[in-house]
Structures are given as C-alpha cells and as structure tokens.
C-alpha cells in the first residue's frame, strides 16, 4: 500500500533526529529557578543541551503553566523525548500537591498495610504508582524518582524514615518492585534510590556527609539486597554516603570503587546511573570539580536541582557529552517506558480508596 511509505520515511527521519539529538546532549539533568524559563536559562539550555530536566514545587503552580514549562524545556534542547524528572513519592516528599494532584500516603503506610495483608500491600503500592503516572503524565512529566529502596535502621537520621517501605530488605524489595511496575505500566520511568543504600546514614545529606561504618557482610545482607532484586530497572540514583568498609574517603556518588565493585558488579545494575543532587552539602569542592568527580567515578549523569545559574554553568563546564555506554544506557532507559495498562482512572482511584482512601486528601 504505497500511501504507507511516506509515513515510514517520516518515522525513520524522526527516529534519526532523536538519536542524533540525544548523542549531542551533555550528561546532566538540570532544574530551573521558577515557573517559566528566563531568557538566560533558555539560552543556557540551548547552548549546553542537558539530557534531561527536573522540576520541584517551586516550578509548579497550575496545569497550563506546567505544560508550558515542560514544553519550553524540551524545545530548548530540540528533543520531544527529553525526560523530565520529579520526586513524587507520597507522604512528605511530594512536589505536586492539591489541586494539581492528591496528597497521597507515605511508603510507610504501604508497609503497614503489607504487614497486615501482603497481597493488599503490594496491590496498593502498584495502584499508588499507577496513579502517580496518571498525575504526572498529564503534565508531560515522564520520570519519577521512585521507588525508595533504602532500609532504615534504628537510630538513623530521619531523612529516609517513613519514606521507606519497611525495615526489612525483603519487604522493601517487594513493595519497591510493585511501585516500579505501577509507574512503568503507566508509561513512566522509575528511578530506584539511593543506591547502594541510605538507610544507615546518621546525617541528612542535604546538610552533611554521613559515614556508615557497617561491615561489608551486613551491607550485602541488608542494604544492597533490595537494589540487587531490582537491578533490572532502567535508572538508579546514587547515595551521597561514605561506606568505610568499601571506600573510607569518598561517598558512593564519587567513588569509583563503590560504583564499579558494588553497584555494577555486586548489585548487578547495568542501567543508567545518575547522581543524587550535586548541590547537596554532602559533596564538597566547587561545582565544576563535583561534576568531574561524579562522572570520573562512573556515574552516567550529573543531577543538579536548585536552578542556580552560576552553579549550573560550573557543572556544565566539566560535564562531557553523553556518549558510549552511557548513551546506550540512556537510550535503553527511554525505550523501556511504554504505557501498558489502560484501566480507567476512576476505577484505579476507587480501588486504591478501598485500601488507603482514608489517607488521601
């Protein structure tokens, strides 16, 4: 049927354009300062071509504004598939709030339900992520930094706390898998975090660099286990945590030993590895040094969140193009996002309400 041929040509042309554009991207994910791009931000993004973007509550006010912001970001880099990330976990970490999206329960609430009824907990975790995919997808946001696979221990800093699915590796892995599956069923990319485990940290990495002195055997048994179980996920985010049994000098994010020996080999993760936010105080040095250290250690992407233009310029100055195996991992990650569940939104919300509706506002 000859009328199909032009469509094939167009599809091939678009695919070549996207692949070429991605190959010209820099290995970084950046935020912006406000609810629309300034001229300086737009000019900077066009010139530096970040692979992806991340948005926070400060960037989000109403539906049309969010659509316009996300479209402007993608327009700057010339890639309609440029991923836009967000932290939309539920509980206290939720960038979209009413009326843009409901207030959802925390991971700990899912864990409590799982403790009473495993099947119900798993289904609720899947449903919550499927609803996240609906909420985010309608604004053009395509990646959610979820599931949290950290296993907190008694006495650890509360930065993880009720963001965790439980206090055993088995429960965290099971609910994390359900959450990741729910996102992917809705066409969103999941990002497991904070590899290889943030649950023992005695400090909030937004403010300080924690050191974990636990033995390698205990880390392997508990902390690494959920990440090992979900090592097939497309994207992971590192922890700004020192594990003295592995590398007593460098946090995982800038430790070649942790990334190569633990994340890549021990855990078996061969997907796209992004840093946690490079503007956190857990990291030291100027921002160009941070970017270089992150990439030299083996991360595929540098994440910078706060939208500070001077910091972003310094990050970009030492960030190399996304190429080689990192580019292939990025392509695989984007290709893994495909809407497969077509259940009506009202039905999904009604079913979730049967489990944890009293905790949704």
Explain the meaning of each model-derived region.
Residues 77-105, 125-151, 172, 180-196:
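Glycine-rich, aromatic-flanked loop segments that form ligand/cofactor-binding clefts
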